[in-house]
């Protein structure tokens, strides 16, 4: 009997190991086929990573890679976040009612026309979950924010890339690319990474000209930097199929809290809410965002500082005989000849910038920093490009 138990135990263990090994070996076969070739988004390098890699003091590193607000969040937003810490044992308000109400008052819309996201990236993903099926088409600019393409591929849709002459979205070409399979069109204005923007008039005309089976998605991540931003609210009130997306990560300085929002018709937002995960925006982010939205003086101050920083960088780049793309946002796309090499050389000096994909491989993107950070970046550029 004891020998039988030994044999049974040995057989069971062998069988278990064999099946575990088979399960592990076949893991990719169990995955959604689309995930296997899915590119992974690469964010800007973190200060801690660069400090460790190059043995630098983190305090001496300038992170000019991710278009963050170098002056930080509004003091009132920071205070509101600290106060919210006392209640982190509780789940956040699931619908974000107070924040949606604050946003709706700011925009002159109803709160049920607002959807909150864990960053505006989540809103982009929700659009895919709700509207895209395999074989659908999504129209994007050649040099637009890469997440539109990544999301489309993950959903089984086909991203249709439209050339951007002079690094500006060609709305006529985008319109000509529409087919009966087109579901979504993404237009970021200002655009990341080029910093270019289409005029409000042409954006509104484009949105009004779209056929009924197409949803127009205007990414307004950098809209607070524009003197004359487009306004989709009249089209939204008409019930048109448009959605605008904004973030608290840029001028509001809340990138670390991951919070953004979209606004559109009640019907469109109601559909997106069906795909939204419960408690997707944490309580600290909600509290800080409400305070940030109210502090319009801080936003105006940061906008003015950014304008000054753009002028400082533009003058410095001209003195270095470097070409750049005039920007409507809080960064500059700079032609340095060899983008990857320059990125690495600057990084070794404690200046973190952003290298570009193959289609823009002669450029690096440099976020506007404080006056001192801009000065350090220009000095480092002069050193590495001599």
Language-model features and meaning:
Residues 19-22, 201, 345-353, 357-386:
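PLP-dependent enzyme catalytic core of the Aspartate aminotransferase-like
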């Amino acid at each position: 009997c004891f020998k039988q138990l030994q044999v049974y135990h040995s057989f069971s263990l062998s069988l278990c190991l064999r099946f575990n090994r088979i399960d592990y070996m076949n893991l990719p076969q169990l995955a959604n086929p689309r995930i296997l070739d899915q590119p992974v988004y690469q964010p800007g390098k973190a200060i801690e990573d660069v400090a460790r890699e190059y043995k630098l003091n983190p305090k001496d590193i300038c992170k000019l890679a991710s278009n963050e607000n170098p002056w930080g969040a509004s003091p009132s937003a920071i205070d509101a976040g600290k106060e919210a810490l006392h209640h982190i044992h509780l789940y956040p308000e699931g619908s974000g009612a107070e924040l949606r109400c604050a946003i709706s008052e700011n925009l002159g819309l109803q709160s049920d026309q607002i959807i909150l996201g864990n960053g505006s990236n989540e809103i982009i993903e929700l659009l895919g979950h709700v509207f895209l099926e395999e074989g659908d088409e999504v129209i994007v600019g050649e040099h637009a924010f890469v997440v539109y393409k990544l999301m489309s591929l993950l959903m089984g849709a086909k991203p249709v890339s439209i050339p951007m002459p002079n690094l500006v979205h060609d709305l006529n070409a985008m319109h000509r690319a529409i087919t009966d399979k087109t579901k979504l069109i993404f237009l970021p204005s200002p655009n990341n990474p080029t910093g270019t923007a289409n005029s409000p008039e042409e954006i509104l005309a484009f949105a009004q000209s779209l056929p009924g089976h197409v949803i127009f998605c205007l990414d307004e991540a950098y809209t607070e930097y524009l003197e004359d931003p487009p306004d989709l609210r009249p089209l939204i009130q008409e019930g048109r199929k448009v959605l605008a997306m904004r973030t608290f990560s840029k001028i509001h300085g809340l990138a670390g809290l991951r919070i953004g929002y979209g606004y559109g018709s009640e019907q469109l937002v109601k559909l997106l809410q069906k795909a939204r995960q419960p408690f997707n925006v944490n309580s600290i982010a909600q509290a800080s965002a409400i305070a940030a939205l109210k502090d319009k003086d801080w936003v105006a101050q940061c906008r003015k500082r950014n304008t000054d920083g753009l002028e400082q960088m533009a003058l410095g780049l001209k003195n270095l005989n470097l070409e750049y793309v005039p920007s409507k946002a809080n960064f500059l796309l700079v032609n340095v000849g060899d983008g990857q090499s320059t990125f690495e050389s600057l990084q070794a000096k404690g200046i973190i910038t952003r290298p570009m994909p193959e289609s823009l491989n002669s450029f690096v993107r440099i976020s506007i920093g404080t006056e001192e950070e801009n000065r350090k970046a220009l000095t480092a550029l002069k050193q590495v490009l001599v």
